[in-house]
Amino acid sequence: MEYDYIIIGAGSAGNVLAARLTEESDVSVLLLEAGGPDYRLDFRTQMPAALAFPLQGKRYNWAYETDPEPHMNDRRMECGRGKGLGGSSLINGMCYIRGNAMDFDHWATMSGLEDWSYLDCLPYFRKAETRDVGANDYHGASGPVSVTTPKMGNNELFHAMVEAGVQAGYPRTDDLNGYQQEGFGPMDRTVTPKGRRASTARGYLDQAKSRKNLTIVTHALTDRILFDGKRAVGVAYFKGESAQTAKARREVLLCAGAIASPQILQRSGVGPKDLLQRLDISVVHDLPGVGENLQDHLEMYLQYACKEPVSLYPALQWFNQPKIGAEWLFNGTGIGASNQFEAGGFIRSRDEFTWPNIQYHFLPVAINYNGSNAVKEHGFQAHVGSMRSLSRGRVQVRSKDAREHPSILFNYMSTEQDWQEFRDAIRITREIMAQPALDKYRGREISPGLAVQTDEELDEFIRTHAETAFHPSCSCKMGEDDMSVVDGQGCVHGMEGLRVVDASIMPQIITGNLNATTIMIAEKIADRIRRRQPLPRSKARYYVAGSTPVRKAPLKPAS
């Protein structure tokens, strides 16, 4: 079969492109997805509070593992990636965070990326979004992505933890995606008004899947991209055990994410020549940056016992779960309708940082992100991690076999700045937790525990316990330097008819969760593919810290 466009990967970016390109009825699109449908009756992916479940199996999760990480006690660390219609938006934590305005302004200082400034990107964030409280200069009200804001009457620990951050001397913000990201405040989530996960399959594909010019093939594992010289002309893929090919008249659009996109490029003969020759892969184009510059967010949990019986601990007990499930299923309300990340914040840990370098997610229960190691008592925790680590990793294909996972090394914690930021983060978090707003709730420190105090003790805790925030990115970065893979429109350097459009093309990781920005990138490049005029630049005001101090004097100084 032949199509105008073939999209590889029905994830956060691929579904945006599929929906936008097929708005033109004379354009045909084939969307290939290695996973299955997003089964709407499967509570594991549809109930926000069940977000840990998809990470525990392989039905919706590629379940990659890293190579032994040399600065993390040689641990092989999780690298979960979504599999199925929706991609990682089908299994993520549903935090709707866009990044800091300064992230995009920094991108725009790079050669060839001048139109990626915050004010250039903001109209595309707005285009994608329907926020439940309506539109303003920063938010949309008619986009495919449903965004829900925290409501009065939610867990009181959210409010106490935000208040504690403010009492510790940090700013308060009423919108982490609005005028000012820096500070503590409520956190939006990608959840529908009926309490369902708002993946890009629900938001974008539901609008597009009935169109006759869109063909969606699930359980289609991409083998390689096909070339005629330097031009992409099709895709070879497996449907079960059957080898299939499809031809592309215009372009192949690679949207497989920061792990699989470089893997597919390399397997197709586009990447570092030495690696490809070592694996007996015919070199189509020597492009050394493919798979390099890999970045992620690392985070830790600081956990506390809760003296008041107000945490979500009872919701973890099996005998309470049928009632929670029924309320969610029939009413779309209650504990099940929230991801429980309803408060958080961004701060600068030192004056040398010109925009926030530390992120917080507050959670009114003590448990690991993947649902393991739940504390068997009332508790709460702060997830804290650095935002723009200087550590750089890589993704490398291991063989020609499409079913073999690649070699992944993030090289976490490879610089002294990493260690300084995480030590600072733990000590600052302890100051926040010691503020009067939490006196009523705060019991003993469960993890890391008050015995862990010196730099050496903190470092060992970090090495042993820090985990991925599941934000791999930047492995096919856009730009014009020698290690760039694509230009500012996603076109692969030195090739024709081939783009990469996903989190892998970020030149530097953003300050926050990646899903919203990945959707924005796809919306922006969709206009380029369609040769449309970009949306007019926003004129919204936004906060720049400048010489503003990192914090005011805390209400309760560190003891």
Curated annotation (Swiss-Prot):
InterPro entries: BetA, FAD/NAD-bd_sf, GMC_OxRdtase, GMC_OxRdtase_N, GMC_OxRtase_C. It holds the Pfam family GMC_oxred_C. GO terms for biological process: glycine betaine biosynthetic process from choline. FAD binds at residues 4-33. Residues 182-202 are annotated as: Disordered. It catalyses: choline + A = betaine aldehyde + AH2; betaine aldehyde + NAD(+) + H2O = glycine betaine + NADH + 2 H(+). Its cofactor is FAD. It is an enzyme of class 1 (oxidoreductase). It comes from the Bacteria. Keywords: FAD, Flavoprotein, NAD, Oxidoreductase. Gene3D superfamilies: FAD/NAD(P)-binding domain, Glucose Oxidase, domain 3. Its EC number is 1.1.99.1, 1.2.1.8. GO terms for molecular function: betaine-aldehyde dehydrogenase (NAD+) activity; choline dehydrogenase activity; flavin adenine dinucleotide binding. Pathway: Amine and polyamine biosynthesis; betaine biosynthesis via choline pathway; betaine aldehyde from choline (cytochrome c reductase route): step 1/1. The active site is at H471 (proton acceptor). GO terms for cellular component: membrane. Involved in the biosynthesis of the osmoprotectant glycine betaine. Catalyzes the oxidation of choline to betaine aldehyde and betaine aldehyde to glycine betaine at the same rate. Belongs to the GMC oxidoreductase family. This is Oxygen-dependent choline dehydrogenase.
